[in-house]
């Protein structure tokens, strides 16, 4: 197991939820956190604890973003007119690594970030190697031709059930994904309940 895979499962255990819906997640077998104290009985969370957990879960889902990265995205969402929680989700889903993951070009969001960082994708014909690159509606993301035979890509794209959300249009014959529109919270296929409203409450008080 790679360090990144181990870290991913540690996030699941810390949250006590299978946040990516993976069949091999350890929380499918045990419902306590990582470490020697993980099996202690969980106390009911305070409002602060509930809000913090909501933030950590959303931050972890997108590849365990650092607090600095996540706080910057939140600050941008806060400046946009509208519901801050909805804006936050929309900005997160516009990340290039998130779109590569949603398009099922690779199996995990961690793999998507690495895939982008290694220069395997283009946006509107130009190579982009920054996972946090923010896509716009109408942008066309494509796996470079020389990268299409990589084992990680073949494994992901040959899955019988792809379940790509409708705000992304995928053409697997060309290995392209068109970002159609910015989604709202209800559009995003999270395997677990995400509560960006609690993230807003957390930052409002801290």
From Swiss-Prot:
Protein name: Small ribosomal subunit protein uS4
GO molecular function (one): structural constituent of ribosome
Keywords (A to Z) from UniProt: Ribonucleoprotein, Ribosomal protein, RNA-binding, rRNA-binding
Listed CDD domains: S4
Region (Disordered): 15-46
PROSITE patterns noted in UniProt: RIBOSOMAL_S4, S4
Organism lineage string: Bacteria, Pseudomonadati, Pseudomonadota, Alphaproteobacteria, Rhodobacterales
Organism: Cereibacter sphaeroides (strain ATCC 17025 / ATH 2.4.3) (Rhodobacter sphaeroides)
Domain of life, per lineage: Bacteria
Subunit structure: Part of the 30S ribosomal subunit. Contacts protein S5. The interaction surface between S4 and S5 is involved in control of translational fidelity.
Similarity section: Belongs to the universal ribosomal protein uS4 family.
One GO term (biological process): ribosomal small subunit biogenesis
UniProt key word Secreted: no
The protein's role, per its UniProt record: One of the primary rRNA binding proteins, it binds directly to 16S rRNA where it nucleates assembly of the body of the 30S subunit. With S5 and S12 plays an important role in translational accuracy.
Single GO cellular component term: small ribosomal subunit
InterPro entries assigned: Ribosomal_uS4, Ribosomal_uS4_bac-type, Ribosomal_uS4_CS, Ribosomal_uS4_N, S4_RNA-bd, S4_RNA-bd_sf
Domain called S4 RNA-binding: residue spans: 94-157
């Amino acid at each position: 197991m790679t360090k990144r895979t181990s870290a991913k499962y540690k996030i699941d255990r810390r949250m006590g939820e299978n946040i990516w819906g993976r069949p091999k997640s350890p929380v499918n077998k045990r419902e306590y956190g990582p470490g020697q104290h993980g099996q202690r009985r969980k106390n009911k969370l305070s409002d602060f604890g509930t809000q913090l957990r909501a933030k950590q879960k959303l931050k972890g889902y997108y590849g365990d973003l650092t607090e600095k990265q996540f706080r910057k995205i939140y600050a941008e969402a806060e400046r946009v007119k509208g519901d801050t929680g909805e804006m936050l989700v929309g900005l997160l889903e516009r990340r290039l690594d998130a779109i590569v993951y949603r398009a099922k070009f690779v199996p995990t969001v961690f793999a998507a970030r690495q895939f982008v960082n290694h220069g395997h994708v283009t946006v509107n014909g130009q190579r982009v190697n920054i996972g946090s690159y923010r896509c716009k509606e109408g942008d066309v993301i494509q796996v470079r031709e020389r990268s299409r035979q990589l084992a990680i890509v073949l494994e992901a794209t040959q899955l019988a059930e792809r379940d790509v959300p409708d705000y992304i249009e995928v053409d697997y014959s060309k290995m392209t994904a068109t970002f159609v529109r910015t989604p709202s919270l209800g559009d995003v296929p999270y395997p677990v309940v995400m509560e960006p409203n609690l993230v807003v409450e957390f930052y409002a008080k801290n």
